[in-house]
Amino acid sequence: MTGRSNRCCRAVILGLTVGVLALAATDRANAEAQLLIEASTGKVLHAENATYPWYPASVTKLMTAYTTLRAVKEGRLSLNTLLPISRNAAAQQPTKMGFKVGAAVTVDNALKMLMVKSANDIAVAIAEGVGGSIAGFADLMNANARRLGMSQSNFVNPNGLPAENHISSARDLGILARALIREFPEYDSYWHISSIRYGNRVMRNYNSLIDRYPG
């Protein structure tokens, strides 16, 4: 995860935490894109280049989480479903959990690792487990984007690693963040995890505002 994508992800997750969705990004041409909306109503409080297309990087994982939770809600899998770590998943770089090929994690733990560690290997394991393949999962992501009205988005992979035609906008990610809040209130705890323990290691959330900001 780059510094830029890290900042983007913190902005979106802050919105999920406090009820005001704040999105900020710098695209490849260094044009600022900003969006501040009220989560409960969708009212736009501030916008600057909100419809400007830009590369969403690790914020992509919010759509990965959304698509996974939709599958759970529709009964296609459960939070206890085991997701195997394939050779492709284990090979992902740079931010990863580092599971060996053949290991398996539950959907519940995978979502926690995704939100806290932004783990690219876990994102691929989720994609393969839910969609059968990265391409199949991308189709599900794009179907969800169209259904939500995210007209400026196209997803190619579940982790946001650089790929041609992988694109979104602050407006579209605001729509997605609101959908996560409104459609899955029972899973609100995923957006508030400050750390997870993996063996003897404690991994802190990249969003340093969790547990430090009221809301």
PLM regions and their residue ranges:
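Conserved catalytic neighborhood of penicillin-recognizing serine enzymes
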Residues: 91-123, 204-215
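Bacterial N-terminal signal peptides
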Residues: 13-24
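Active-site SXXK
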Residues: 42, 55-83, 173
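Second-shell loop/turn segments in exported
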Residues: 48-56, 94-101, 109-113, 123-132, ...
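A short, well-structured edge-of-sheet supersecondary motif
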Residues: 27-47
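Short, glycine/proline-biased beta-turn/loop segments that scaffold the active-site neighborhood
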Residues: 74-96, 192-200
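Bacterial N-terminal signal peptides that target proteins for export
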Residues: 2-15
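Penicillin-recognizing serine hydrolase domain
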Residues: 107, 133-215
